Structures are given as C-alpha cells and as structure tokens.
Amino acid sequence: MIKKIIVVVAFMLTGFSLTAMSASAEEITDLFLQKEVTYSGVEGGKIGENWKYPQFVGEKAVDGDETTRWSADKQDEQWLIVDLGEVKNIGELVLQLHAESPVYEILVSTDGESYQSIFKEENGKGGQPTKKYIDGNNVQARFVKYQQMKMWQHTNKQFYSSSIISFEAYEKKRLPEAIKLLTENLTISEKRKQQLAFEVSPAGVDITEDQIEWSSSDPTIVTVDQTGNLTAVKSGEAKVTVKIKGTEISDTIPVTVVAENKQYAEMRAKWKMRLLGTTQYDNDADVQQYRAQIATESLALWQTLNQAADREYLWERKPSDTVSADYTTQFTNIKKLALGYYEPSSELFEKPEVYDAIVKGIEFMIDTKKYNGTYYTGNWWDWQIGSAQPLTDTLILLHDDLLNTDAEKLNKFTAPLMLYAKDPNIQWPIYRATGANLTDISITVLGTGLLLEDNQRLVQVQEAVPSVLKSVSSGDGLYPDGSLIQHGYFPYNGSYGNELLKGFGRIQTILQGSDWEMNDPNISNLFNVVDKGYLQLMVNGKMPSMVSGRSISRAPETNPFTTEFESGKETIANLTLIAKFAPENLRNDIYTSIQTWLQQSGSYYHFFKKPRDFEALIDLKNVVNSASPAQATPMQSLNVYGSMDRVLQKNNEYAVGISMYSQRVGNYEFGNTENKKGWHTADGMLYLYNQDFAQFDEGYWATIDPYRLPGTTVDTRELANGAYTGKRSPQSWVGGSNNGQVASIGMFLDKSNEGMNLVAKKSWFLLDGQIINLGSGITGTTDASIETILDNRMIHPQEVKLNQGSDKDNSWISLSAANPLNNIGYVFPNSMNTLDVQIEERSGRYGDINEYFVNDKTYTNTFAKISKNYGKTVENGTYEYLTVVGKTNEEIAALSKNKGYTVLENTANLQAIEAGNYVMMNTWNNDQEIAGLYAYDPMSVISEKIDNGVYRLTLANPLQNNASVSIEFDKGILEVVAADPEISVDQNIITLNSAGLNGSSRSIIVKTTPEVTKEALEKLIQEQKEHQEKDYTASSWKVYSEALKQAQTVADQTTATQAEVDQAETELRSAVKQLVKVPTKEVDKTNLLKIIKENEKHQEKDYTASSWKVYSEALKQAQTVADQTTATQAEVDQAEAKLRSAVKQLVKVPTKEVDKTNLLKIIKENEKHQEKDYTASSWKVYSEALKQAQTVADQTTATQAEVDQAETELRSAVKQLVKVPTKEVDKTNLLKIIKENEKHQEKDYTASSWKVYSEALKQAQTVADQTTATQAEVDQAEAKLRSAVKRLTLKNSGENKKEQKNGGNNGHLNTSTGVDQTGTKQVKPSSQGGFRKASQFLPSTGEKKSIALVIIGLLVIASGCLLVFRKSKSKK
C-alpha cells in the first residue's frame, strides 16, 4: 500500500495568518516507503544467524502496511536509520508508534556520520500507542535516525522497547484542509453556556487559538467568544461559525435556544437521588448506617485533604496505586467529600469552606494535574472511566450551585469530560469501545449532556448504547445461551457483564419517560442473559468465581468485584435496576431470586452493609418489602454455557460449576498485575457449592494451592506469574449435552501451547444427586508431577472430620461436617486407592496474587486435599470417582457397595456410563459404539428411556464446527413423537445440524419396537416358593408344576416374544387357581389362646431385660401362630410350649429402695465453686464429675451401685481442684504512665512512631483492665509504653523513617505422624490397602501440665480481648 496525502488547498504560514498558495491538488508521497533501513536489533534477538521474530524486523516500519511493525530489542539504546538514497528536503515526519518509549529523538544526517537532532521527546507515554507529527523545518537530509534512549515498563514489571508501525517523511509540511465543529447542531436552554470544540484535518496539523475566528449570526440570541465559549441569550435560532483566519476554511452549525427543558431537571434529579437518597427509609437502621458511613468517610477525607498553596497532591497516593489509578482515587475522594457536603447528618453539611475546597480540588486536578481532556498516561480506563464517572457524579451534585454562582466553572469542569468521553464508541486512544466499556463511557456522555443540557450528547447515547444489546456469536457481547464475553474470549458475566448491566440500567432508568428513552427490540437479548446468565447462574447470592476473570484476585472492599458475595451484592444492585424496565414475568423472577438468595445466605453475609449508593440500598429494601419471605423459592437449573465453556447445575441440595477452555475461550486473564496465579482455573476446575458459604469466598484465592485446584488434571511444574495468560487450547472438544435434568460434560485438555505436553480426556456426568467423574488418555511428562485433584476443599478442622472406608470393590472418603448438608463423599474403585490425602494449613495475602487491589491482611486456611499422583510420566492414565453431597457415612458406605451406575467405557476414544434409565456418552473420535448407540462423529449424547419403547435422545456437538453429527439407534425407530427442528431422522440414523448452535443441545423423542418385559412373569414365579407338593392333590399339583416349569423356561429364554411371556404368565396364574389342598384335621388352639390371654398382664418395667426379651419374642410368635389360618397342630403346640417356658424364666427386678442421701448432699455442698477460681484442667475434671452425679441423682432407675460410684467420683474430683494463685498485682506505675500520656495527638507525630506508640498504649490499657494480669505482664506493658513514648518523633523533626510491612508465610499443619517435607499431613494407605483411620493422625497430647498452661493462657487472652472490646465499644 502506497501512503499518500492529498492536499486540497495549500497555505503558507505568515505570522499568525495563513495565505493561500494554490487551489490545485498536489500529491505528496512518503519518502521513506520501501527504503533501505538499518537497525540495532529486534525483540527476542537472534537464534544463530536469524532473528527469533522475523515478523518484527526493521523493514516493517517502512513497508507501507499498517498491520506490521518493527519491535526493537529489550535494551535502552535502540535505533533505526532510513537511507533515502540521496539528500532530500524534509518538510514533515509522521511517526506512528504501537508502543511509545518514554525518551527518544529524531536525528538527521547528509553523510551518515554526523547527525543533528530535530526533535526530542522526554515525556513519552510509555507503552501507549500514539501518532506524532514532527515538523521537519525543510531540513536537508539523506539519513534519518530514530533513537530510543529508554525502555518503558509494563504493569507486569517487565521492560519493553519501542514498537513502530510506520515511519514516514514528506517533502512539504501539511497545511489545514478543513475544520469541523464536533457538534453538528446544538439545542441549548436559555442562560446556558457551552464550550464548542473543533478538529482540523488532516490530523496532526497544528492550529493555534490566535488563528481561529468565531462568530454568531445573531448575538441577541447566541454569543460566542474567541475561545469558542457559547452563551444562550434568549429563545430563537442562530448560526455559529468557526473559521481559520486568512482562509475560506470554516464550519457553521445551527444553534437553537429554547426555554428551560424540564426533562433535563427531572433526569438530573433522578441522578441526584441515586447519590443522596430520599426520605423513604430514613428510620431504617441500614439507611441510617449508610448515612453515617458517608459522614464518617467525608470527615476523614476533609481532615486529610492537603490544602497547601503549593500543593502537589490532594490526598497522599496509596502505595498500591499506579500513576493513572491515583487519578481515579483522587476524583473518587472528591466525590465522597461532596457527598458529605450535601448529607444533612454530616459535620461538613453545607459548610462554605468545604464547598470551596471541592471546587478548588477539581480545578487543581484539571489545571495542575492535567486532567484536561488530552493528557493521559498509564491505563486508559482511569482517564476515560475511573476518573470520569466520579467527576460526573460530583458535577451533578454541584450543578445547581455552580449554575447560580459560577456557570463558567461548570463549563470548565465539564470540558475535559467532553474530550475524554467524546463519543460512546471511542475507547482511548484509538480503539472501538464495546460491551461494558461502551456503557461505562456512555454514562459520562449522558452526564455531560445533562449538565450542559446538550441534546446531541443524549442522542449519541440513545444511538450508541443499544449496540451492546445485540446477540453475538463471537467476540465481546451477549450470547443466546446466557454467556457474556469481554476482551475477545474471556467469560465475564461476573465483572464486565455486571458493568454492562449497571451502565445500561442506569442510562435506561434515567432516560425512561424522556424524549431520549431507548426502545430497541434487541433489549430482549439482555433480558434473556439476565435470566440464564444471572438468575440461573448465581448460587446463594454469590457470583461464581468461574465467570469473574481476574477480579477473583482482588481483596475485599477494594473494588465492587472481589469475593463471590461482594460481586453478588453488586449483581443484585444491577438486577434491581433492570427490574425497573423489565417485563413483568422477569421482574417477578428477579424479585423472587433476590429474596431467595438473601434467605439462603441468612446472617452469613450482610447485603445491606456498605451499599455502592443510595439507589442500590433503597431498591433492595423495596424488593425485600415487596413480598413475604415465604415467596422465596430456590431456582433449579442446569446450563451448559457453550459460548464461554462453563457449566452450572443447581438443585435444592447443592450446585456444581465446571470451568474449562478451548479454541474459542481463553484459559485465564492476567493483566494490571492481577490474577498472577490463575494458570489452572479453567483446566476443568470443579466448584462444589453447599451450605458452606465461606467456600470460594474471602481468603480462598489467597490461600488455595494454585497448582492443585479441585477437579483439575495438572502438570504441577512451577510457573511464572502470569505465564501463558490468554492462551486458547489447540482443542475444540469442550462442552456437552444437557436435557434439562442431567448433563454429559467433557473437555479435551491439551496444554501443548503452554510449555507442557500434558493431554487428557475429562468427563463429568451430572445426575440429580451424583457427580460421576471420569478421566482417560492422561499422557505427559514433567520434572514435577502429573496429578488429578479429586478435591482441595477449604475446611474448618474443628467442624469437619475426614473419614474413610472400603468394600470389596470400592473405597470411599468423606468430609463429615457439623451441618450434615455440608457432608461430601467420594467413592472410587479400589484400583484408585493409591490416593494422596492431606490436611494442609496454608497462609497467604491478596498481594501474592494481585498488586493492584490489595489489603494488609494475612489469611490462614486449612484444606483437605485428595489427589491421584501419576508421577513424572504417565501414558493413558485414567481415574474414576463419584462425588455426592449431604450424605451420611452410612449412606456413602452403601453407595460403595451399590453406586447406582455402571461405567460402560473409559478410554481415550469414548467415556460412557449407564445410570437408571440413562445412557450418557462423550465420544472423542469417529465411529464409537456402546449400549446400542453408534456415534459416527465426535459428539455428546444422552439417551433416556421414558417408557417401554419410548426414548428421548439429546445430542450436542461440542466441537462447535457447525457440522452435522449423527448417531445410529439400534432399537428400530417406528415413530418420531417430537423433535427440535435441527434434528432429522433417516431410518434409524438421527442427525443433528449444529450450525449456529454454539454447542447447545437438541432433543428428539422416538417410539421403537417395544422391548419384551418379563417383570410380571418373574415376580409370579418368585411368589410360588410357598407352595409344597404335600399340601395339594396329585392331579392339581401336576397341572401346576408343568405350568411353573414352562414359565421358568420362557423367563430364561433371551429370544422369547412378548406373546410367549404373556401366555406363560396366564397359564401359571390359572394353574395356581386350580390347586386343591389336601383335607386337614381341625387344629385346636384353645390352650394356646388361653395362655396368651393369661400373660397379657405382665409389664416390661417389672422384669430384667434379658428375661423380658425371651418372653416378648415367645409371646409375639405365639400370637402369630394363633392368627394363622394355615398353622398346623404341631406349630400350635410348639408355640404354646415355648411361651410357657418363657413365662417361667421371667426374672423380676429387685425392688429395694436406693439411698441417694449422701449423693444429693455432696452435690449441694459443692454448688458454691466457681470456674474462675480454679485451673482449667482441674475444673474440667470437677465439672464432668458434677454433671454425671446430677444425672444419676435425677434417674429414677439408677441402682445403688451407680449412686455410690457417682458419689465417690465427685468427692475425688473436688479434692483435685487446684485454685488459681491470687497474689495481688501492683498496677500503680502502669496506670500513672497511661494517664500521663493521654495528652499526645496523632497529628503531631510521624506515622511510624505514632503506630508504635498507639499499639503500646493500647496493650498497656488492655493489661491495666485485666483482672487476671500477672505482675510480669504489668511490668512488661509499662516498659514497652515508656520505650514507645521516648521514640515519639514530631513531624517537623526532619526524621523520615521508612515503614516496613511484614508479609505472611505459608504455614502447614504439622501432626505427630505422616508429615512430609512441606509440613503437610499425609494420609497414606495402610499395608492392608485403603486408609488409616483419622484418629491415627491426631497429634501427641504431651503432658497434662502443658495443656493446662496453654488453656490458662488462652483464657487470659480471651478475657483481655473481651475487656478491650467492651471498652472500645463504650468509647464509641
């Protein structure tokens, strides 16, 4: 492609005017195009004689192709020289950079030896794309050199060099061809002002303010000054023109001035209500708490605001903030300060000095910090969204005050926003905005439109925003199955999707009822995603981590999207927005879902605490108050989200999610130093949700072993932070079939493009109550280990116990919890019993996985890890295990004997199971056959028998290649009862046309030749065991026995027809009816009935247990025989004799009175003792003995021996009581120094010295308040406080001590047995196979005295903490 610039009109610059030179077109060609270049290096360097990355060589900078680039080597000093072949006049240079260096210059030479600089950049936007137009000043040169002096640093801490898309040169400097106002027509209210902006073409031509002329056709209606600031004087129409002086180049727009449009005031009022709330719930505790939060936060910001005349910042920059992130923080702080100014309960309410500080703060950010609409560095998001939105909110709050007192300031403050958010479709600096980014930018465009009452800005929003509602089949956007993708191929319902909901919801609710309301039919796509991708996706009010991308690595309360509950709270706020304009049925579903989630999570999470704004809080209150909690109904759902390789099944007991990736979907996103260890989060990770709400929530991602995530098959080799981020798999077989009740899910795991050679075929068969996990074809080598992680579950050791058992075929492990609903069982064949089971304690910080959104907290969690280790090398490895939830150990043991399913095949070609009426299969290759199903293509199939001869078959094409896939059914299809339109039938072959289905399933119901059913015949044969030949006449028995023999023959025949079966059943029933019994002598039951009657008087309480058992069994048998019409005389006589014998052996319980006098007396005497007076160990023995004594005393059936034993044990327990020493402790000096140092104030001292002092003072006060503190503790607290006082340093003393932060260390739970080198407890198989009992891994108890001392210490600490808590509470 030849690069040319067509100049329509050329001008010569004279002073501050432009003089026309020519009206004819002149063609100017790029002098550098295809010229010879030399350069210092290429990214990646050389391998032998060749560049590692030939696509980045220097020639690409002058090849005329804007899709190629030169990428310099990673060194500070890098250069590229273009040889023109001869000396040329250079009027202008154009440098288009893919990534700009911080420091570089352009030099020229005529001989290639001596160079002179004509341009130098010393403040380049490191790493950002940019285009520079450089004045050549008609210099004469043959050689032009680009010289980089400094690399730029990425947020991943790596350094990179320049990357040049194109380097161009032209003989003549380009002059303006056209000028265009950015507003095509303007409607403005009376007395309003607006700053007009323009652009000159071609891009890069510099025009100064002095060269521009502004004019109005009617100054009585509109005036415009020479900076383009327009004022609406009165109603009417006029035209405003901008012109380049000395030329005919100009642009004119019509301006209509109208009386104030009340719609603008109404929309600003809606916006303001979101920020300041209403009086509707002023008596509500949560609303009052939020108002108090606003007041507290704003006061703290007011007290820390830097108001110095020569200030360089408003608030000190947070350590974790980048330069650009600090802008977002500063504008957010200004907004919070403004909220305090307008909040009636705040100390800052309507204080003039606060208002003045807010206005001056905004001016400081625009004038001094250059938030001016053109400057930016670092992350584009902070400029266009992060800073723009809180500034817009602030200006909405200030609007009325600014308009009445200083309208010029309103225009000035809005002007940068008009440039940063010029158009909803433009993402800085040169990209097209999509999805959530578009709606976020649109919020600022809408806000500025409302601030300036600019119709065109609202039209921009009205036209641009509905584009996010379109249903897409690739890239960013909404998908028909409920998926939401951002950044091209990452699942993001959780964060970016939520931002889209919020952005669209806020915009639509503000525009609703106005002239600019959005009425786009594609809004139905949004409602569909809200239903499938939010209501059906969320679990217990939590947004699953598997759809939240890199936001899972953020510390709580550092961002709206952090933990699953925090993201869930943000989602609920957004759903309440959508409900305001949703169809009634969806609105009802939203309300029911929210009520259900709040009910499910109970008191574990407070959804009303720290809302994002008043609107979110009030809307949630409205939902809760709209109906009774009884309406809350858990939603059951099963979704295969083929467009984002995610699966979620929800039922009443649990939910399970599966996270995968493929050729279509990325493995994980790492960016801005976030999610540094997300390597394996899509390698088939399984999320099992029950009533354990802490699972996958706060602290989980900071402590979980990132190499061993539940459900994954992994190569555990060490990986660098962010390694292989954004990789898509070489394989596309990921997904599965789903009939709404069960699902057959599979993943072809292939790590070959991530520095590993591991491959595996993984399947999950999701039944109602069972998860069947199969793996096959596991092949790979590593210098670490290859493992399958059955689970790695965060547990509470004091609540969860590890159990195990085995049967002849299968073994099992369970995690039994305090809440039985949280029990989890794992059943696996004995071939899998070489499992590693570990209880592991791990510590970590969010700073370990994210450097952007962090807190200071170190988390420590315990994990139960169950894994199969294949070693360093594995070929065609497999696994099989069943996961169940909410089952007792007895139920899990029973499952190990009868799992309820059969694995039909588990190979690299086919994985299939049969369970009840289902056959489920994932075929990885062509031509696979199992259980009467022949799959011609790789596919996923569920066959369900719904009646005799009636089947529902569900098919899916997980390859998503739009091809047709077929299966042959051996039953012989007689009729198609129902079928989705994408399914066709040809004889017994069923074909799915998968084009456009994105992996989703389709079903068909067919009738086949009915199967021969023998159940009734087999049952009838079984019932005949009671008949005996001696009881019937010979002739009737002959007919019967022949019919029975024939029935058995038919039952055993595999080829018998249904007619033969039915005939055999009929003949056998007839033969049974004709049986004639041999006459029998009348049986006499008189004596039996008499003895039964005589012995009904006996009562169990009067006899010993053993004698009563014999008697009661004999009586029961006698009654049974007496009731039988077929009992023989021998049976009657035997029952009578047995009962008489049982009556004789009855032994009466002794009736001697038990004496409890002494026991009751000693219980009474010892009620005076109090726990606080005795050591913990002695009190434990005493309290248990006292409890047992009281139990025996209360028992009416206690024997004298039991009473005497209880008395003896209690007396012994009383004697061993050990009193706590009561020596008086002297706290005089400690209390004195505390009193003397209450005068100090934090503002007078350096932060580091104050921290040491305040902690010492706090500890001293704690010890002083403790009634159980020892003299040593008192003395130590006093010494520590005296030392801290001495070290206090005044702020003006010049000392600047660096504060150190201590990081957390990963810890492991050590036990007395089975500890490996990492400090984790190994639960290994015993020599007999299976596992040792959990009790074998209990730690050694040590001496009783040591335990006692530990308990005493813990009690002292706990008492102190309680006193401190009460004291701090009273101070508040």
Swiss-Prot record:
Span(s) of short sequence motif LPXTG sorting signal: 1338-1342
Ranges for domain FIVAR: 1014-1075, 1084-1146, 1155-1217, 1226-1288
Catalytic activity, EC: 4.2.2.-
InterPro entries attached to this UniProt entry: Big_2, Chondroitin_lyas, FA58C, Gal_mutarotase_sf_dom, Galactose-bd-like_sf, GH-type_carb-bd, Invasin/intimin_cell_adhesion, LPXTG_anchor
Keyword Repeat: yes
GO BP term, example: carbohydrate metabolic process
Record's protein name: Polysaccharide lyase 8 family protein HylA
